[in-house]
């Protein structure tokens, strides 16, 4: 029996995607060659890359709107550096909502002045700041849409006359947004898209070419755009599985369909956290993440009993991040509703035993 996988990342992927990927590793396109041993410049893989990029723009509603999609290496953490290298000329504005935005701020300070427009650090990042001012003379505004560690998520995004850069690593393709509000989006694959190894960048090409510095080729967005994500050898397997996952999502009905499912999952779990007297949520209710629910036991003496119950129920990956503790249930796109119900059942069983 497959486990209920609440891992924060790498995370659960659709079963049909795993099946197709495993077949491709042995025999890709019935050519008696493995996907991971063919040339990345062969016609079969070039078709994979083109399809993956096209699916990204289709799903986000950005086709024919001046955007291009890139599949790069280095993880989303590499984008903390790369965005600033390519966009920060003098000053940038950053919203600090957690560990990942803090890391992005640290990297960006290497290239210019940083304005931290707001931060929720004062309360261990358990909320999203509101009502902050973004300086109009900044080169861009950077935010993180979802915070896996603390369980918060931006529900709206500020209107700003400057370019907006967003780290959507943990909630891209999970909800409907006007993605044309963003000039650059980046996301590590290993949450809602595929296995670790590739990073998606969706970029409006007209924001490039404005910094007064030489940019190393491997870190230069324009070079990667000119080479269609083939400047160097791409992470073939990760791109292929990401393509399969995007096809899966598209066939289901795209983002509108999966957003409805994600809302059902989050509502089910948060209702139980709020109802059950043994548990307490860690994030402010209005800013709760649909992707990552963080919570604790009010009585830590019940920890061993609860842990044994959820492990016996075939639940995986429920421990909270080491910097926060408690529990974290990550409910990415591929997690079925019945897995959330299994967790709720365990929480109710603990209540009966307590």
Predicted regions and their residues:
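N-terminal "arm"/small-domain region of PLP-dependent enzymes with the aminotransferase-like
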Residues: 1-39
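PLP-dependent enzyme catalytic core of the Aspartate aminotransferase-like
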Residues: 3, 328-354
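Active-site phosphate-binding strand-loop segment of PLP-dependent enzymes
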Residues: 9, 108, 120-172
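Active-site C-terminal subdomain of aminotransferase-like
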Residues: 14, 189-270, 284, 353-354
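Conserved N-terminal alpha-helix of the aminotransferase class I/II PLP-enzyme fold
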Residues: 32-82, 99, 107
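PLP-dependent aminotransferase-like
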Residues: 76-141
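Conserved active-site segment immediately N-terminal to the catalytic lysine
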Residues: 165, 179-190, 199
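Conserved PLP-binding catalytic core of the aspartate aminotransferase-like
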Residues: 279-309
């Amino acid at each position: 029996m497959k486990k209920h996988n609440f891992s924060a990342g790498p995370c659960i992927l659709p079963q049909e995607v795993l099946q197709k990927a495993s077949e491709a590793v042995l025999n890709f396109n019935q050519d008696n060659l493995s996907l991971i041993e063919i040339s990345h410049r062969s016609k079969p893989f070039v078709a994979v890359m083109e399809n993956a990029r096209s699916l990204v723009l289709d799903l986000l509603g950005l086709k024919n709107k001046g955007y291009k999609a890139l599949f790069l290496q280095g993880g989303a953490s590499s984008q903390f550096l790369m965005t600033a290298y390519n966009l920060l000329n003098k000053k940038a504005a950053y919203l600090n909502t957690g560990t990942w935005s803090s890391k992005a701020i640290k990297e960006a300070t290497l290239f210019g002045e940083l304005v931290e427009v707001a931060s929720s650090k004062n309360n261990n990042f358990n909320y999203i700041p509101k009502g902050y001012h973004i300086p109009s003379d900044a080169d861009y505004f950077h935010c993180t849409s979802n915070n896996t560690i603390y369980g918060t998520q931006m529900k709206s995004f500020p209107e700003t006359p400057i370019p907006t850069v967003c780290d959507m690593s943990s909630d891209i393709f999970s909800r409907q947004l006007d993605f044309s509000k963003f000039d650059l989006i980046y996301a590590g694959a290993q949450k809602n898209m595929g296995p670790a190894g590739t990073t998606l960048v969706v970029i409006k090409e007209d924001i490039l070419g404005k910094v007064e510095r030489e940019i190393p080729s491997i870190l230069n967005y324009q070079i990667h755009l000119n080479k269609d994500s083939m400047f160097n050898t791409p992470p073939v397997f990760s791109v292929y599985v990401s393509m399969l996952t995007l096809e899966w999502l598209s066939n289901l009905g795209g983002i509108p369909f999966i957003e409805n499912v994600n809302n059902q999952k989050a509502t089910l779990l948060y209702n139980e956290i709020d109802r059950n007297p043994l548990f307490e949520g860690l994030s402010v209710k209005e800013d709760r993440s649909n992707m990552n629910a963080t919570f604790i036991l009010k009585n830590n003496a019940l920890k061993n009993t609860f842990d044994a119950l959820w492990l016996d129920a075939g639940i995986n990956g429920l421990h909270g991040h080491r910097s926060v503790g408690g529990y974290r249930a990550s409910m990415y796109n591929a997690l079925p509703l019945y897995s959330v119900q299994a967790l709720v059942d365990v929480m109710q069983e603990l209540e009966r035993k307590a």
